[in-house]
Amino acid sequence: MIRIGHGFDVHAFGGEGPIIIGGVAIPYEKGLVAHSDGDVALHALTDALLGAMALGDIGKLFPDTDIQYKGADSRRLLRTAYQAILDKGYQVGNVDITIIAQAPKMRPYIDSMRTVIAQDLHCDIEQVNVKATTTEKLGFTGRSEGIACEAVVLLIKQNGTK
């Protein structure tokens, strides 16, 4: 059996950089406003994983009203959510992430993001795709007011599990 999940996240720029995207620190003059570390890619991916298994969303599992998640490392949140997926007998088939930002440029960091995500999901790097696009200077991302991200994940039932 397979399950598909979709996730979305957005954060506004604010404060000082760097920013963390896909588990990778990216030098930038602005930071991202968030309760945790503001990693839009890992937040969207975590939401996609949880959604695929009908486990709610990142806000349900890691509420921003809980002080223990203040400044939280999104890699830790991703690994915790993925463990819930593994516990239900599923594993990642593939992941596809689209980062939507006018700036900073993501291309130099994408291979590192893929490596980090593959490590956290215990899968091959070939199962993880990360790409970036702009909105051609339209909307809040086009005005460099923030960053958005979408993620799609395919989960596959592991052999021998109920």
From Swiss-Prot:
One of its GO terms (molecular function) is 2-C-methyl-D-erythritol 2,4-cyclodiphosphate synthase activity. It catalyses: 4-CDP-2-C-methyl-D-erythritol 2-phosphate = 2-C-methyl-D-erythritol 2,4-cyclic diphosphate + CMP. It comes from the Bacteria. Keywords: Isoprene biosynthesis, Lyase, Metal-binding. Pathway: Isoprenoid biosynthesis; isopentenyl diphosphate biosynthesis via DXP pathway; isopentenyl diphosphate from 1-deoxy-D-xylulose 5-phosphate: step 4/6. HAMAP family: IspF. This is 2-C-methyl-D-erythritol 2,4-cyclodiphosphate synthase.
